[in-house]
Amino acid sequence: MTYECLQQYWWFLVSLLGALLVFLMFVQGANSMIFSLGSNEVERRLIVNSTGRKWEFTFTTLVTFGGAFFASFPLFYSTSFGGAYWLWMIILFSFVLQAVSYEFQNKLGNLLGARTFQRCLVLNGILGPLLLGGAVATFFNGSNFIVAKDNMVDGFELQPVISSWANASHGLDALLDPWNLVLGFAVFFLARILGILYVMNNVNDENIRCRGSVRLVGTSVPFVVLFVAFLVHVVLKDGYAYDPVSGIISIVPMKYLDNLLTLWWVAVVLLVGVVLVLYGIIRTIVSKTYIGGIWPAGIGTVLTVLALLLTAGLNNTAYYPSNADLQSSLTIANSCSSEFTLSVMAVVSILVPFVLAYIVYAWYSIDKKKLDKEELSTGEAY
């Protein structure tokens, strides 16, 4: 496998992890609606225990996503995670707060009360998807950073800082771009949609299911409007292309539309993903008995996000544009690890299907029985 193929292969794997992370944020979506889907303490505990079965999947995928980026594209890791640290610290803090809230809300000696920790889960359910969506949007809209490539390691002499943020906001400036917020809120509403569909499928309670069906309508409308608006914005906006020979980066009109036309199979994946998400939503709204909407909508989410991330990084495109210095923009060619590192990791990645198979098996084992009120009396309940 050539160096170029390895770069594309690892961009695909990182994109797949990112897509799975967005799907698994149904945990955050459901948690953001604890007080909306649950009308009393028992129903709220049902929702918390339902998402409590899966929150570790989301947290682990978030960490794995960051680790895969660090290993395969270390310059992005140091630039974004090291430069935009306020944005990423808030995201990580909200996820840590989630873990603490699950474990301590009903413990003996909890002086704050269960409702306080439930509100913390709601906070994570809002901030997590919103900020992650905004961070992903910077792949298309750019960020304010500078990469001093002359400061790379020169022989055995270590040079000063390679990448730095161009202002004192350290990532919070991403929230000042309206289009970053558009995708951020689109991901937030998508997480809520997936959360509703998951709870309807996982919790055996008619009151929660009926309430979820109603909430699904009010959540789907803003999601569709925001997502379509962002998609139109992306395909019509100027993109950032790089010359594979010289590495020079230039602005190209409607670059992302060209990517979808050139990489036609990515466009097909995007279309199939969108159709599956809409199918899962519409069928759940129309049918009174259908509770399996999480599966077509979940698979559609993975395909849609995967296609968007592939569009951002393939076909000689700068996946992390710099608004401060165009030539500092990051590509899969100038930000990746060495050929040896990518080759070794590619061999190890053969084990990924086995890990995914184990996750599917664990998921099936956990969900073999639908959650009901009887399980709240067990010692393992949150």
Feature annotation, model-predicted:
Residues 30-44, 73-77, 99-120, 199-212, ...:
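Membrane-interfacial helix termini and the short, flexible loops that connect transmembrane helices
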Residues 24-32, 52, 60-108, 124-154, ...:
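Transmembrane-helix bundle segments that line or gate the permeation/cavity pathway
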